[in-house]
Amino acid sequence: EERSLNMQREYDVIVAGAGIVGAAIAYGLAGYDKRVLMLDGADTDYRAAKANFGLVWVHGKGYRYPEYHRLSAAAADAWPEFAAGLEAETGISLDYQTGAGLKFCLSDDELSARAKMLGAWEAETPELAPSVRILDRSELARRYPTMRLGPDVVGASLGEQDGQANPLRLLAALQAAFQRRGGMVRNGHPVTSIKP
C-alpha cells in the first residue's frame, strides 16, 4: 500500500486525517497553491463531526485567559464570511445560524454566579464590545415564546455572538472544496506511524 501512495507525484504537505480539523488545514493549504495529500482511515472510523453540535461559541470562553476570549471572538466574527465563501465554492449549505447561545441556570445562586463570572470575563477584554446578557425566566419566556422551559430554569446567559453550523455539512464542504482546489484524498489509508 505504501507504494500506491508514491504515485509519481510529490506533495508539499501530507495531512493525517480528513476530519474537520484535518480537512480545514488541508483546505487552507490548498488555497495557497500547495500540493496537499490528505490520508484518512475508514468511513466507519470515529469522527468528532458525528458527535458534536457544531457550535461557534464565544460567551464564557477564555475566562481568566483573555487571549483565548479574543481569539474566540475574532473566530466568531470571521465565521459569516468563511461560511459564505465555502458555500459559494461548493454549493453546500452549512446551515450557519448566529445570534443566540443560551446557557441555562437552574437556581438563583447559579444565575447570580454566572452573571458575576461573565461580568468579570467581559472586564478582562475591555476593547471588545459586550456580547452577553443575563435573562431571568420571564425575559426568556418573552424572548422565546415557543420555548418550553423546564420547571427548574430560573434564567440563562445569552451570548449574542454565539452560533452554530451543521458539522456534517461543514465536513463535506471542506473536503469537497479541498478536492476542487486540487487536493488529493486517500481514504482507507490510516496513518499508523510517522518516520523522519
Walk through the language-model features, giving the residues of each.
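Glycine-rich FAD pyrophosphate-binding loop
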Residues: G31-A51
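Short beta-to-alpha linker loops that shape the active-site pocket of alpha/beta-hydrolase fold enzymes
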Residues: A42-T44, L140, L174
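Short, flexible, mixed-charge acidic loops at enzyme active sites
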Residues: R47-G54, P145-L149
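Helical element adjacent to the flavin cofactor pocket in flavoenzyme catalytic cores
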Residues: S157-P196
